[in-house]
Amino acid sequence: MENKTQFELESRRFVLGGAVVALVLIFILRLFFLQVVESDYKAWADSNAFLKKTLYPSRGMMYDRTGRLLVYNQPAYDVMLVMREIQPFDTLDFCQILGITKEQFVKRIADIKNRKLNPGYSSYVPQLFMNQLSAQECGVLQEKLYKFPGFYIQNRTIRQYEYPNAALVLGNIGEVNRKDIENDPYYTQGDYSGRTGIEQSYETYLRGVKGVEILLRDAHGRIKGRYEEGKHDVPPESGKSLKLSIDMELQAYGEKLMKNKLGGIVMIEPETGEILCMVSSPTYDPSILIGRQRGKNYAALQKDPLKPLFNRPLMAQYPPGSTFKPTQGLIFLQEGVITPETTYTCAHGYTYRGGKPACHGHPSPLPLVGALATSCNSFFPWGLHDMIDSRKRYPTVQEAFDVWKEHLVSMGYGYKLGVDLPGEKRGFVPNSKFYDKF
């Protein structure tokens, strides 16, 4: 009797478990149907009835502080395709018009279908086949486009530069990658975004908002015209233009001074902190990173041993030189190491224990104001020497160094300035442990 009851309980458990599994499977199948089958069917039905054509906005322009136009747009044309609409055609003729080989054609089609490279791929949705055709190339293709079903021309704009200067400040734009598409739903395969400089920092301001034009198809898939006379179209919104703090005349002059040299020049308006010019040398003409040769030219810049893509004012760490002297003087005064009347002798440089900083000839000895006026290379090393070696003020050398560093940090040394350009590196302020290594 007990065995029979146990058997019935086990049977009920089995039936109940089977029912639960069945319900879960039904739920999963329903989700699959709703998310995959129905969405694909809807995309198929929509693509049969309509062509939703993206309208790309004009990117915002850039001006310098005086109102000079620096960056603007010019028309360009992309070749788009809807994969399911492609029918047999003369690929040789098509390739000759676009100046590509048949092998390149086949590879482009394969890359479009590759969801690893193109996560947003759908045979119902327009895909980028070739970008940035010139007006002449577009005209030739437009005349024969009827021979190539599934392909159409997409109007775009590309950047143009009024001056061959400030490449690393202005930045450049390039095609978005998979990560960009996954992180921002605004982008689709073939879109462009700012990759460096101001173009990157102000991408969301400059790019604008896309629009859409809905075109009606007939039963054969041919475009009949705008759906309901454009009632449902959404016009694009142009990007916002920017007025920079840069003075292009100063920028160009700085680049001229730095030609065939390694280094940088930064000019700052003291009252506002605005950057008037930021020169990095060597540099390059920003116009070489537009058009279909962008990839080739960018690769050449990357391989250049002089590193023209390296923004030295932002990324390199250089000794501050004589610009550091006023800071040193303030620290010495604050700590009571010197007074405004304290003088140091300059024997054409700081030679204590083999010191290296040489100095030009000037009256000696000098107080602080005179040392700043003549940029003396002896006064400030002697001041630091007296501060570090003063056991009356600081019990140890280490404590003296730490106090010195605290003053520097309090004035902003060792921090990023927070300029609106990507890639900035912070400065290095040594402490006593750093000098213990020597």
Give residue spans per PLM region:
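Periplasmic/cell-envelope proteins involved in peptidoglycan metabolism and beta-lactam response
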Residues: 1-293, 317, 400-410
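Beta-lactam-recognizing serine transpeptidase/beta-lactamase-like catalytic domain environment
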Residues: 7, 71, 218-223, 227-233, ...
